[in-house]
Curated annotation (Swiss-Prot):
GO terms for biological process: translation. It comes from Nitrobacter hamburgensis (strain DSM 10229 / NCIMB 13809 / X14). One of its GO terms (cellular component) is cytosolic large ribosomal subunit. Residues 1-23 are annotated as: Disordered. InterPro entries: Rbsml_bL25/Gln-tRNA_synth_N, Ribosomal_bL25/Gln-tRNA_synth, Ribosomal_bL25_b-dom, Ribosomal_bL25_C, Ribosomal_bL25_long, Ribosomal_L25_dom, Ribosomal_uL5_bac-type. The gene is rplY. Part of the 50S ribosomal subunit; part of the 5S rRNA/L5/L18/L25 subcomplex. Contacts the 5S rRNA. Binds to the 5S rRNA independently of L5 and L18. This is Large ribosomal subunit protein bL25. It comes from the Bacteria.
Length: 233
């Protein structure tokens, strides 16, 4: 089961832009709890605490128990907005979670054994094409990461969604077999491969070309005794 974090909030008696600005001036972030067939509940959260939660990472995949007027509300953040200049939170939305609820979330990918991949050892670079996978899972069992083992990838090879083992109960939303990771060759690698192939082909052709004169010489040698015999007569 995913770890549930605690978060304190205060009910907002008023909504609207003016009330939201007043909350921000008081050092609080306006927000709302909605969903689970219940009316929306305007709230406010202390700005320093919310900022700390956001900066800690994985905010949008963390389940919270919000304490509000003596009651706890099981929620998950669905969106937040930051000030475009000062980069502090100015609004937050929470989705209320009912018992046994499932949810769609985006789970980050964590790479395993990237340093031992054959393609990396030959000078390639790991390119994480997709940083997170959209999945559906139980709200109480959201994985922190989806692990992708790239330890066997050769140069120019890729790891796809079908190559990754998802945790039990986690279903991908994508229908196509997406490319998650590729090993990108270093600059000039394609030319080196072509040059090596050309050299190998030339090396194979050289003995065949050298065999023709030998056959001709053998034929000439076969005629020599006949000519010599005529002279002896």
């Amino acid at each position: 089961m995913a770890t549930v974090r605690e978060l304190k909030a205060t009910a907002r008696p008023k909504s609207g832009k003016g009330a939201a600005r007043a909350e921000r001036r008081a050092g609080r972030v306006p927000g709302v709890i909605y969903g689970n067939n219940q009316p929306p509940q305007p709230i406010s959260v202390e700005e320093p605490e919310l900022r700390q939660r956001i900066l800690a990472g994985r905010f949008l995949t963390t389940v919270f128990d919000i304490s509000l007027e003596g009651k706890k509300h099981r929620v998950i953040p669905r969106d937040f907005h930051l000030d475009p200049v000062k980069d502090f939170p100015i609004h937050v939305d929470f989705l209320r979670l009912g018992e046994g609820a499932t949810i769609r979330v985006s789970i980050p990918i964590r790479l395993l054994k990237a340093d031992v991949a054959p393609g990396v050892k030959r000078g390639g670079t790991v390119n994480l094409v997709i940083h997170a996978i959209d999945v559906e899972c139980a709200a109480d069992d959201i994985p922190q990461f989806i692990e992708a083992d790239v330890g066997g990838l050769e140069m120019s090879h890729s790891l796809h969604l079908s190559d990754v083992e998802l945790p039990p109960g986690v279903k991908p939303l994508a229908r196509e077999d997406m490319t998650l990771v590729t090993i990108v060759p270093p600059s000039g690698y394609a030319e080196e491969v072509k040059a090596a192939a050309a050299a190998a082909a030339a090396g194979t052709a050289a003995p065949a070309a050298g065999a023709a004169p030998a056959a001709g010489a053998a034929a000439a040698g076969a005629k020599a005794p006949a000519g010599g015999g005529d002279k002896k007569k």
